[in-house]
Amino acid sequence: MEITERAFWTLIHGMGFGGLYLLACSGALVGLYQLTASSTSSESPHGQERFVRIYLIAMVVLAWAAVLIGAYVIYPWYRATPPPGAVDLSMFPQHLLMSSPAMIGWHSLGMEWKEHVAWFVPISITMVAFVFIRYGHDLRNHTQLRSAVLVFGLASFVAAGIAGFFGAEIDEHAPVRGGSTIQLGHREAK
């Protein structure tokens, strides 16, 4: 099996860091809610608190990795400019999308979302992690702050989900191609 270098980076960005982030979001929201909602102390609040801190830090790393790889590794390939008079735009995803009225929306809405709004994901989850690390289980005594943390966590999840949807659709219609070929596994000759 073969994959190009650019397709590999796209896979790492979307399915690796982005996909894991989306999977982790639901667990984080439930964990934050359970740890900060109850007025009674649980059996082991310090152990749970430590776990949620580590979990949130891992989410921060996933979110920043996805956004930074998307912005500084994949996006320049997406925006590559074709030479004058080029007819085959398959190596120039942005121009391929913009060349068709049926697909221009994937660039004008989808990629614009990914370029700008997707940055909200790591920023908001970093805020959530910072506030939780600062207040921990005591966050239950600060209802407005607790509500803000949960809302920002949910908003981060929604923004990441929409960015993931647009990324998958853009990759389906105009994938980032090129680069050296990576061999995955060995092929036997018959």
Where are the regions a protein language model picked out?
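Polytopic transmembrane helical bundles with strong interfacial aromatic enrichment
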Residues: 1-190
